[in-house]
């Protein structure tokens, strides 16, 4: 499927859905709309439902959503693909703080789930041996009090540590657990903004390797993430078509793939070059325009 739409302050300005069989090289159009040209082509949809869509369509509605409500199979398939996907926004500080203090659904009662989380955390922190969970109900507020169990050195007993006192990286991994588990189980797509925030580079690489390992990811789940960590710009981890850059100019962001990038000589980027080094040298664009930092304007020596 090839689906997309454009929106502006007046609503949907363009929308299209094209489809092709895996054995074919060309797409056929299912529908297309273009407000600027006053064009609406629904010829690829069932004829008996085209009139219903035409009458129900407004500037704020998507054909794919209307088609799904009308039980049109091809629209349902595309709509459900988006519905199964998960989005995590760690760039939103308030939302991120809420995620850091939340646990997977059913965590308090499900001992097996708690064990699964411990096993997940053991990939980078073997000191956490379990959890202690208490339900809190003061009448005004309901919630959970959670401690992590750490085995004492040279002892069979445990030290309890309030969950909120764990490192930010541990809290983020706990927040990610249910999202990772669900998309890997369903074979859907996980979108994560600022995946690298609060995570060690090697830990983040471990997450990428999990998606790249067919034994751990048999359902072909996908991970799409933003990051400022350049350590992963390497051919040993990612293909050129898996690396995308965003270049900001005049309030707009342009998105382009390393596979599409051409040098000044018009040549494609070779697979054997050092992606990270070339990126930091500015060869691929998408880097900030920096000048020397001066916090105080004129300093005590009279220089700016």
Question: What residue spans do the PLM features occupy?
Answer:
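A short, compositionally biased
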Residues: 8-13, 140-145, 239-240
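Short polybasic amphipathic segments
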Residues: 13-20, 144-152, 244
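Amphipathic, soluble alpha/beta structural segments
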Residues: 48-75, 202-215, 228, 281, ...
């Amino acid at each position: 499927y090839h689906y997309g739409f454009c929106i502006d302050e007046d609503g949907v300005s363009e929308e299209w859905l094209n489809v092709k069989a895996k054995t074919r090289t060309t797409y056929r159009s299912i529908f297309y709309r273009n407000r600027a040209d006053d064009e609406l082509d629904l010829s690829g949809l069932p004829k008996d439902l085209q009139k219903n869509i035409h009458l129900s369509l407004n500037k704020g509605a998507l054909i794919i959503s209307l088609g799904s409500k009308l039980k049109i199979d091809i629209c349902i398939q595309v709509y459900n693909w988006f519905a199964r996907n998960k989005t995590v926004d760690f760039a939103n500080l308030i939302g991120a703080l809420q995620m850091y203090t939340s646990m997977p659904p059913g965590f308090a009662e499900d001992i097996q789930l708690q064990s699964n989380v411990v096993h997940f955390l053991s990939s980078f922190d073997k000191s956490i041996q379990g959890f202690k969970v208490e339900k809190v109900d003061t009448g005004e507020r309901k919630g959970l009090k959670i401690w992590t169990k750490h085995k004492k050195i040279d002892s069979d007993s445990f030290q309890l540590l309030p969950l909120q006192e764990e490192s930010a990286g541990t809290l983020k991994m706990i927040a990610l657990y249910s999202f990772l588990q669900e998309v890997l189980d369903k074979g859907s797509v996980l979108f994560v903004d600022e995946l690298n925030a609060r995570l060690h580079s090697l830990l983040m690489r471990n997450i990428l390797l999990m998606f790249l390992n067919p034994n751990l990811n048999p359902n072909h789940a996908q991970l799409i993430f933003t990051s400022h960590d350049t350590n992963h710009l390497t051919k040993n981890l990612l293909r050129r078509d898996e690396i995308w850059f965003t270049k900001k100019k005049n309030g707009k962001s342009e998105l382009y793939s390393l596979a599409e990038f051409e040098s000044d000589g018009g040549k494609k980027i070779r697979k054997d070059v050092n992606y990270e080094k070339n990126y930091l040298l500015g060869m691929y664009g998408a880097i900030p325009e920096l000048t020397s930092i001066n916090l105080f304007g004129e300093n005590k020596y009279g220089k700016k």
